[in-house]
Structures are given as C-alpha cells and as structure tokens.
Amino acid sequence: MLLFDASILSLLVLVPISVVVFCLSLLIGHFLSEPLSDLAKKTAAYRNGADIPFEPDGRMLEADRLTVDFKQLVQTTKQQQHDLAIKEQRQKEFISDVAHELRTPLTAIRGNAEMLTDPDLPPSLHDKFCDIIVNESERLSRLTHDLLTLQRIENSPIPEEMQRVNLRELASNVVDALHPILQDRQANTLVTGEAPDVLGNPDSLRQAITNLVENASRFIQPGGHITVELAGVNGNSVVAVKDDGCGFGDVDPKLLFDRFYRTDASRTRGTGGTGLGLAIVKSIAEAHDGTVEALNLPEGGACFMIAIPSIPADISEKKVTRK
C-alpha cells in the first residue's frame, strides 16, 4: 500500500515537472530559433533583391554577432557593386569618347587621300592635301598615345614603383627637355621655389608636369611667360604652372580636367593638343593621393596646380622607397 502511494506521489510530482520542462523547452527553443529564423528570412529576401536592414535586436548574443557579420558583408557587397557600376560607366564613356575623337582625324585622312586620286589635281593642292594627311596622322598618333596612357593610369591607379622624388629637380629637367618646343614658341620659362620631397613614381610625375608646361605653352603669345612655382603648403608639395595667356574665362575649372573637354571646339586641335593632357594630370595626381586645381590669374593668364602629400621630414630613406 505504501509502495502504491509512493508511486502515485511520484507521478503527481513528475507529471507537472515534465510539463514545465516541456514548456520551458518550447520557450527556449523558440527564443533560440526565432532570431536565426528572422536572419534567414532577411538573408533570403536580400538574395532576391530586397533592401533589407541587418540590425541586431538584442534578443540573442550569438545571433546579434551573426547579424553584425551579415551587415558588414552586405555593406561590402554594395560598395563593390557601386564601384563596379562606376567602372563600367567610365569604360562606356571612354569608348564613346574614343570613337568620337578618332572619327575626326580618320575622316580628314580619308577625305584628303581621296582628293589625291584626282589625276587633274594641281600640284599646289597636292602638297596641301599631303600636309593635311601628315598632320592628321601625327595627331592620330598623339591621340592614341594619350589614350593608352590615360587608360593605363586609370586601370592601375597605384604607381608600380614609389620612391622619394625631388619636384624642383624634376620640374627643371622637364623644362630642359622641352626647351626646343618652348624656344620654338618663344616662351620665357622660369622655375622657382622649393617643395618638400614626395613619395611617387618619377615617370608619372614627370608626365604630369610636362603636360602642364606644354598646356601653358600652347596658349601664350610669342614672347609670353611661363613660371613653374614650387612650394610646400599644408603638408602638400605643390607645383603651380602659371602663364600670361588668355586664361579660360568663366568655365568651371573642374571641367578643364575632364577627358576631351574644350572651351572652344577648335581650340585644342588648333594648338596641337589631344584634349587628354589635363585628364592625364588629374589621374596621375589622384594616383598619388593628390589633387589638381585651375584658376584664372587676376593679372591675366591661368594657373594649373598639382598638390601631392609631402614626405614628413622625420621619415628615413629606408621607409620611403616602396615597391
């Protein structure tokens, strides 16, 4: 009898406990699975294209950590998609610009070549058409070279070899190398000032300064002046190329560094440029974490500047050179 009563008592105790344990198991299981289930639903919705916010709700530490990881992954993916879209748009614009710019010299070459087939063409016109073909061929060669240079810089924005560069020495070398061209255009050129050394690719920086000096030489009058000024400003080494030409009027200075931008439809072709020189300067500056700027001078003429972060004075030579 006592054994039977003990069994009944055990059942009366175990049954409620079992019910409580079962209910607690369901509650805990729901507490554990619901955050994971919500995260799974958000992930599925995001995979289908929905813009779902991934924010931790504090219900479960592990789920919150996983949510934060997913949030970072989503942000990284969105940034990569954005960067890819920008790159694709630039490629489309580049191809469109190339097609447009190549059409002009090719049309001129073909048209004048067809005129040369005329057996009754006077000798004077024959020489004229030949000169046009030669000039347009040279322009086409320069354009192709600049296109390849710009594309190389934009596709590989970080210079392959970075080393200490003395901009004053580099600017002087550029002016010396351009002496025949500057002399032909009767340009009076002066290099002045000093700037702290920078960490950069010497060939790329030489190209940038060359383009700025050549650009200035195209828009000065015979006997005009070009000044290459160097200075250290707010932690940057600045190269400013000034001329006493006609300036660029009311044009937005930022537009001057766009590919193929011209303030005058015939201006660049008439001066032998390709419309890519300043765009190359901008790309080189940005590849060195630098900036470009253009402004009209109060006394007349224009100033084009490139600013590159200076090497701090306390940095040793061993820490400067990088490949």
Residue ranges and their predicted role:
Residues M60, E161-D176:
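A conserved beta-strand-to-alpha-helix junction within the catalytic ATP-binding
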Residues A216-S217:
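Short helix-loop "hinge" at the ATP-lid/N-box region of the Bergerat-fold HATPase_c
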Residues E286-K323:
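C-terminal end segment of the histidine kinase catalytic
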Residues I181-L190:
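Short conserved segments within the C-terminal catalytic ATPase subdomain
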Residues N155-E160, G193, D197-N201:
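Conserved micro-motifs of the catalytic ATP-binding
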Residues N135-L140:
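Short alpha-helical segment of the dimerization/phosphotransfer core of two-component systems
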Residues F248-R262:
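Short conserved segment of the HATPase_c
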Residues L2-I95, R110-D118, P122, R152, ...:
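Membrane-proximal HAMP signal-relay module
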